[in-house]
UniProtKB/Swiss-Prot annotation:
One of its GO terms (biological process) is defense response to bacterium. Has antimicrobial activity against E.coli. Plays a role in the defense response in the male reproductive tract, contributing to sperm maturation, storage and protection. Keywords: Antibiotic, Antimicrobial, Defensin, Disulfide bond, Secreted, Signal. It holds the Pfam family Defensin_beta. This is Sperm-associated antigen 11B. Disulfide bonds join 80-108, 87-101, 91-109. Belongs to the beta-defensin family. One of its GO terms (cellular component) is extracellular region. It comes from Mus musculus. InterPro entries: Defensin_beta-like (IPR001855), Sperm_Ag_11A_B (IPR007988). It is found in: Secreted. Residues 1-26 form the signal peptide. The gene is Spag11b.
Length: 113
């Protein structure tokens, strides 16, 4: 008799492991209709239209106050006429930028031909 019950209990255990939420299905429907309970001193944040704000507070950095040192520019000013380049607003396709013409950051572009 024990060998006959073993497959039955094994299949029952297997079904219970596959579907663990079925035993609590009736209590889930009951819990969904109840509003969430909060302690009296801690209510969730409310938005302008009454919706709950779900994001958390972000730690903000203090504002930068003078005197602070700006990073040095890492661009190189070159003599564009000497390198047979052309100063223009931006380099076109297949042109190579060799540096900048002035502090206005106009690139010095070399033509490929």
């Amino acid at each position: 008799m024990i060998p006959r019950l073993l497959p039955f209990f094994a299949s029952l255990l297997f079904a219970a492991l596959l579907f663990p939420g079925l035993s609590n299905a009736s209590s889930i429907n009951h819990l969904v209709t109840e509003p969430p309970s909060f302690p009296k001193d801690e209510f969730p944040a409310r938005g302008v239209n009454g919706s709950q704000l779900l994001h958390h507070r972000v730690k903000r950095l203090p504002p930068r106050t003078p005197p602070y040192h700006e990073p040095e520019p890492n661009y190189q000013i070159v003599n564009c006429k000497k390198s047979e380049g052309q100063c223009q607003e931006y380099c076109n396709f297949m042109e190579t930028q060799v540096g900048y013409c002035s502090k206005k950051k106009e690139p010095c572009c070399l033509h490929p031909f």
